[in-house]
Every structure is written in structure tokens, then in C-alpha cells.
């Protein structure tokens, strides 16, 4: 379970990191080159798609951070947990659940489920 927790932490850290070379490097180390990102507004693929998804969230809701808000649950290569999104000193603006599919230590699929307001 420690390895899974490490992957989830690296995933959330990547989504919270600012644009730049460090985020590009983090994306390459956490996600498979052919990663699929399924979000309510559409599907993206690959490292470039991951960068686009992160950049879109950060530009839409600047100053917010994702935090895990529930236990990590695992079934074979599927990992899921609840999250909240908000500013460090403010209220949460969204909540939901991530579903990750793993291949070894790489995330090959990320599906984002956003709770209804």
C-alpha cells in the first residue's frame, strides 16, 4: 500500500505544481506516455493531454489545490480516492473522486468524477 500511496501523492503533487520544467518532468515520471485522461468535459491522451488538463484547471481556478479527502481504495490495478479542491486558506470549491488505472508504477488512466454542487 505504501507504493500506491506514493503514486497518489506524486499524482496530486503534479496537479498542484506550477507550469514549467518541473511539472513536465513530474508528468513524465508519474504517467505512462499513452495515459488516458477522462474528465466530465472530454477525453485527453498522452503527456501533452495531461499538461493541457492541469493547465486548464489551474487557469480556471487559480490559487486552488487538490487534496485527498478520503482513504485510498485499491482493487488490482484500480486505485480510487476522494478529493477536494480549494485554496489553502479558503473554502473548498469542488469535490470529487479520482479513479486511477496503473501499469506497474505508471498511471495509464485517470478518470475524474466531480460531485454535483
Predicted regions and their residues:
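A solvent-exposed, acidic/Ser-Thr-rich amphipathic alpha-helical stretch
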Residues: 23-77
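Short glycine/serine/proline-enriched coil/turn segments at secondary-structure junctions
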Residues: 75, 88-92
Amino acid at each position: 500500500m505504501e507504493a500506491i500511496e506514493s503514486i497518489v501523492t506524486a499524482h496530486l503533487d503534479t496537479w498542484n505544481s506550477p507550469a514549467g520544467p518541473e511539472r513536465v518532468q513530474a508528468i513524465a515520471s508519474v504517467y505512462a506516455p499513452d495515459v488516458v485522461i477522462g474528465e466530465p468535459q472530454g477525453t485527453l491522451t498522452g503527456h501533452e493531454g495531461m499538461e493541457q488538463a492541469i493547465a486548464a484547471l489551474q487557469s480556471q481556478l487559480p490559487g486552488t489545490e487538490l487534496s485527498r479527502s478520503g482513504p485510498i481504495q485499491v482493487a488490482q490495478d484500480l486505485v480510487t480516492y476522494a478529493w477536494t479542491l480549494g485554496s489553502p486558506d479558503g473554502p473548498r470549491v469542488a469535490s470529487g473522486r479520482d479513479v486511477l488505472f496503473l501499469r506497474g508504477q505508471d498511471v495509464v488512466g485517470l478518470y475524474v468524477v466531480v460531485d454535483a454542487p
